[in-house]
From Swiss-Prot:
UniProt miscellaneous comment: 6-tuliposide A and tuliposide A-converting enzyme, which are compartmentalized in the vacuoles and plastids respectively, come into contact with each other for the enzyme reaction releasing toxic tulipalin A upon cell disruption by pathogen infection or herbivore predation.
GO CC annotations on file: amyloplast
Pfam family, any one: Abhydrolase_3
Taxonomic lineage: Eukaryota, Viridiplantae, Streptophyta, Embryophyta, Tracheophyta
GO function terms (MF aspect): hydrolase activity; lyase activity
Descriptive protein name: Probable tuliposide A-converting enzyme b6, amyloplastic
Amino acid sequence: MSVALFCGPPPAVSFGCKDGRGRKGMVRSKDIVRQTVKPPAHACRLIGWNKYPGSVVPTNSSLSPSPTALDDEIELDPSPFLIIYKDGRIERLKGTTVIPACPEVATKDVIIDPATGVSVRLYLPNVVDLPSKKLPVLVYFHGGGFVIENTGSPNYHNYLTLLAAKSGLLIVSVNYRLAPEHPIPASFDDCMAGFNWVVSHSAGPAPEPWLARHGDLTQILISGDSAGGTVTHYVLLRADAGVIEGAALVHPYFLGSKRLENQTEEDFEFHEKLWRLSTPDTEGLDDPLINPLAPGAPSLAGLKCKRAVVFVAELDFLVERGRMYYDALVKSGWGGEAELVHQKGVGHVFHLSDYSGDVSVDMMAKMVAFLRGE
């Protein structure tokens, strides 16, 4: 079975870049798609994020605003991720392109919960030569700040295809619901459901034949990047003991109410607002869901895995939070083996867009070695 990274060009889609006052003068790009969906009614009222009230409406009070003008009024502007209009539409600016599952490289999509629409994408490496071999299973959670990306995003599809080919693991990538339409903890709940769905194949009838035939359910690992790294920590606290062999947290999206020295005020404020948009009922950046080191957060000694590795990038806004997490884990009394991989000269999730650079190749080698237990 050959493993191809690209199954064909992404679909031709378009996206409009805002000029600060609606969609006037927008440019088109084939790489991004406009999604118009309705968020919860309260989501747009919570934070004053670059509001432009009425700026596209005629100033002459005798004129009635046109429907087009009203449609284009911006309520919140957390670009470059998304724009929320006053009529409730959400326009995602990135992370929406979907590459279809590729039968040529043994990938497929499976809906695991028809009620919520939560699905998984499975990546089965070359088993034609070893049809009876059972493979370790990696459950993966994608990033995107909880508001963008999906299992079919080109970066994730191509990266996980490559990872499956190099590691020889059967990978299950969870396609969870996004905020603000589905406020947190929906994404956390969906990922936990995806993990439990995989584990369920170890007892009783197995609904997914790939996992039943090729998955070694005694060797389950989990991983995620950015927001997916945050979810990885969440799952580690809630899984049954003895189920997870190892966990890899890649540039985990951990925040906190205190701005660190390496974090600019602009970046800090952006991520605070993004978290509040995603989590309307949050108490702030010391919510244990986003800050595992906050007062009252569950002890890291309770992580349910034997091995853990934390990847951090020198130029990443989140680098110090990742290092702090690793240090706290080592000091927590947790009984597993912990490793920190600090890579220099690169930024947040650099490895998803550059597969051939020296640092990316080194990171892939370290990830594969960890997953294999080498």
